[in-house]
Amino acid sequence: MRLVQLSRHSIAFPSPEGALREPNGLLALGGDLSPARLLMAYQRGIFPWFSPGDPILWWSPDPRAVLWPESLHISRSMKRFHKRSPYRVTMNYAFGQVIEGCASDREEGTWITRGVVEAYHRLHELGHAHSIEVWREDELVGGMYGVAQGTLFCGESMFSRMENASKTALLVLCEEFIGHGGKLIDCQVLNDHTASLGACEIPRRDYLNYLNQMRLGRLPNNFWVPRCLFSPQE
C-alpha cells in the first residue's frame, strides 16, 4: 500500500481497497476540487479532507461510519423539544450560508477552506450538493450539507448556533429522506456525536457495495427542490 499522487490531467482514482491503514483510509493526494473529480470521488466512496496549507488529501476509511435513517436515536428530551420546536426547517434555501456556517463555527479550526466552499457551491449549482437550514424566525441558527448519490446521502458537515439546531436538521432530513425512498446517510468517520445519534461502523467493502447499488437509485424528481420541510406549531 502506498500513497498515490493524483494527476491534474485525469480524474481517475485508485481503488479504495489500496488505502493506508495508518492513517486510516488515506488513499491519495493532489489533484483538484473540480466538480468532475469530486463527483468521481463520491461515486467511488472517497472524500477530501485536509488542513489549510496542506495538499488535497483523499480518504476512504475502513470501517466506514453510516447512519440508517430509521435508526436515528432521538432522546426523550429531544422528542419533547421537537414537539414544541421554535424552528423552521428548509431545504436548499441557503446553501452558501450553511457551508459558511460550518466553516466558521469550529473553534479548533476547520478544513472547510475558501477553495472548499467554492468547490461545493459549484456542486450545489449543478444539483449534486444540498443543504438543510434551521431558522429561528429569520435567523439561520443551524444546518447541514452534503452530496447526494441516488438514495444515499453523503453528509459533510453540520453546525449549530442554538439549542438542538443541528439535531433538528438531521431529524427532519431523516424523516423526509425515509419518506421518499432514501436508504442511507454516510457519516464518513464515527465520533462521539454521530454515535450518540445512532451512527455505526460497517466494513468499507460493505459500504462500497451499498454505494454501488444506491447511487443508481432515484428519489422523486422534485425531492431536492427548495422547500419548507417543517414549521413550528402556531
Curated annotation (Swiss-Prot):
Keywords: Acyltransferase, Cytoplasm, Transferase. Its EC number is 2.3.2.6. GO terms for cellular component: cytoplasm. GO terms for biological process: protein catabolic process. GO terms for molecular function: leucyl-tRNA--protein transferase activity. It catalyses: N-terminal L-lysyl-[protein] + L-leucyl-tRNA(Leu) = N-terminal L-leucyl-L-lysyl-[protein] + tRNA(Leu) + H(+); N-terminal L-arginyl-[protein] + L-leucyl-tRNA(Leu) = N-terminal L-leucyl-L-arginyl-[protein] + tRNA(Leu) + H(+); L-phenylalanyl-tRNA(Phe) + an N-terminal L-alpha-aminoacyl-[protein] = an N-terminal L-phenylalanyl-L-alpha-aminoacyl-[protein] + tRNA(Phe). Its main location: cytoplasm. Pfam families: Leu_Phe_trans (PF03588). Gene3D superfamilies: Leucyl/phenylalanyl-tRNA-protein transferase, C-terminal domain, Leucyl/phenylalanyl-tRNA-protein transferase, N-terminal domain. It is found in: Cytoplasm. It comes from the Bacteria. It is an enzyme of class 2 (transferase). HAMAP family: Leu_Phe_trans (MF_00688). Functions in the N-end rule pathway of protein degradation where it conjugates Leu, Phe and, less efficiently, Met from aminoacyl-tRNAs to the N-termini of proteins containing an N-terminal arginine or lysine. Belongs to the L/F-transferase family. This is Leucyl/phenylalanyl-tRNA--protein transferase. It comes from Shigella dysenteriae serotype 1 (strain Sd197). The lineage of its organism: Bacteria, Pseudomonadati, Pseudomonadota, Gammaproteobacteria, Enterobacterales.
